[in-house]
A protein has these predicted regions:
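The AdoMet/dcAdoMet-binding core of the Class I SAM-like
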Residues: 1-98, 102-106, 110, 117-119
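Soluble small-group transferase modules, centered on the S-adenosyl donor enzyme superfamily
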Residues: 5-23, 28-36, 40, 109-245
Length: 245
């Protein structure tokens, strides 16, 4: 019953994702589920939102082997996303998480969160194929009526125009996708220097469970993000579109 309440929450924040028969609740350990799936069971998106890395058991959801399982169940063009907290952590811990993810997704990217405090969280995105985001197509889609509720959700959490100004500034709807993509912080190819000497987390060593938790109560999230941003290069081969974009 509690899981269905979670689904209700997803529907509120991500409209159209859980309507009708599109959602089935599976009662299983996430890693066990993905490992025992038939090889031909593929997904457009696999999102991994494990608990904080210092919690017992979380290291097993951040290993090379686990990411490979997820990668092998992506459809062509499919995406895997991973949430990572930068708070209560240190550089070595975050290096381990990111470098491990990039071992499996060498085209991976980092998106930061600077809406409500710099560097508090980050999201990793990975595709098997090189990622290309057409800004013109994205703008057209996100400003269409079919995506109106999704666009509104983005704006409610700070991407685009102030929610209070929506009624009298409808032209600001288009800012949502720009604000979202502006959180791009880096990619694997540009971050090799930052990841130097990172400890790769594997099933055989679970290094993350020994690294995480050593910086509880500290506030190094801004320092960590600034370190990543030193290697920032604008990804003109990822973000494409007309000159006006």
């Amino acid at each position: 019953k509690q899981n269905y309440h979670i689904v209700d929450g997803i529907d509120k924040e991500n409209p159209h994702m859980v309507e009708g028969k599109e959602v089935s609740v599976v009662y299983d350990d996430g890693r066990h589920y993905i490992r025992t799936l038939p090889k031909d069971r593929k997904f457009d998106i696999i999102t991994s939102d494990p608990i904080d890395p210092w919690v017992k058991g979380c290291a097993a959801l951040n290993t090379v082997e686990y990411y490979r399982m997820c990668r092998d169940h992506l459809k062509p063009g499919g995406v895997m996303s991973l949430w990572i907290p930068l708070y209560d952590s240190d550089i070595e811990t975050i290096k381990s998480v990111i470098a491990t993810f990039f071992q499996v997704f060498p085209n991976g990217m980092v998106f930061s969160n600077e809406i409500n405090g710099k560097g508090f969280d980050a999201v990793l995105l990975g595709q098997v194929e090189p990622t290309v985001i057409d800004l013109d197509k994205l703008h057209e889609k996100i400003n269409s009526q079919d995506y109106a509720r999704g666009r509104e959700s983005l704006m409610e959490v700070g991407y685009g125009a102030d929610i209070a100004n929506i009624a009298w500034r409808p032209n600001m709807w288009g800012d949502a996708e720009v604000a979202l993509l502006a959180t791009y912080a880096g990619r694997a190819a540009d971050m090799t220097g930052w990841m130097k000497n990172a400890q790769i987390n594997r099933d055989s060593n679970l290094r993350l469970q020994y690294l995480a938790g050593m910086s509880m109560g500290t506030h190094k999230e801004t320092e960590i993000l600034n370190g990543i941003l030193k290697y920032y290069r604008f990804p003109d081969d990822i973000f494409i579109g007309s000159s006006g974009r």
